[in-house]
A protein has these predicted regions:
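Short glycine-/acidic-enriched loop or helix-start segments at secondary-structure transitions
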Residues: 46-48, 75, 134-138
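Short, conserved beta-strand segments within well-ordered enzyme catalytic domains
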Residues: 34-38, 62-65
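A glycine- and small-aliphatic-rich helix-loop capping segment at beta-alpha/alpha-beta transitions
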Residues: 49-58, 81-85, 139-148
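Generic structural signal for well-ordered alpha-helical scaffold segments
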Residues: 16-27, 47, 51, 84-88, ...
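N-terminal glycine-/serine-/threonine-rich phosphate-binding loop
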Residues: 1-35, 107
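Glycine-rich beta-strand-to-loop/alpha-helix junction loops that act as flexible
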Residues: 37-42, 126-130
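Class I SAM-dependent methyltransferase SAM-binding "motif I" and its flanking Rossmann-like core
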Residues: 124-126, 130-167
Length: 167
């Protein structure tokens, strides 16, 4: 589903509604919901908005990342760290888990992360960067991908050049 939000002032609320609904539908079938979240300033605003809900997000829930920079999770450039800080104030509630790549060795991380991904997601959230990048797939860089199944090692602009990305 492609969602176009006509008014910027309703963007966060609209996206949070989609996230909540996808999780509810999966959990109504008695299963853990599987969602992939993205990084970036736009997404961070959505997660901060979502964190204001008293019942935000409900377990059982597995959160994956559409892409991650090859930096430690406590680094300001880490998408994992950004999601934890903005959505959960750094503390994951019981029954919610983050499944993220170990980016210390990007090529191994891509293979290992691909094996940990579910066969299907209940929702994948992506935004488009001002330079046209999607996840960590950058225009003009597709020939340099080192792919392992559904995950690739990519090269982005400095300062975070190494990345692991869904494809």
């Amino acid at each position: 589903i492609k969602v176009v939000v006509p008014r910027a002032d309703t963007y966060e609320e609209t996206v949070v509604s989609f996230l909540r609904r996808a999780i509810e539908v999966a959990q109504a079938q008695g299963q853990e919901a599987h969602i992939a979240l993205t990084g970036g300033n736009t997404a961070e605003a959505v997660y901060r908005h979502w964190s204001t809900y008293p019942d935000q997000p409900k377990p059982p829930l597995a959160i994956y990342l559409s892409d991650e920079r090859c930096v430690p999770t406590h680094h300001s450039g880490s998408n994992h760290g950004m999601v934890r800080r903005s959505l959960f104030s750094n503390s994951l509630p019981a029954g919610i888990r983050m499944v993220t790549p170990d980016v210390s060795d990007p090529r191994s991380a891509a293979r290992e992360y691909d094996q940990r991904l579910p066969s299907t997601f209940d929702l994948l959230l992506f935004t488009l960067g001002v330079d046209g990048h999607f996840a960590s797939l950058f225009p003009g860089e597709l020939n340099s991908l080192v792919q392992s199944g559904r995950v690739a090692v990519t090269v982005g602009p400095p300062p975070f050049t190494g990345r692991v990305s869904l494809t």
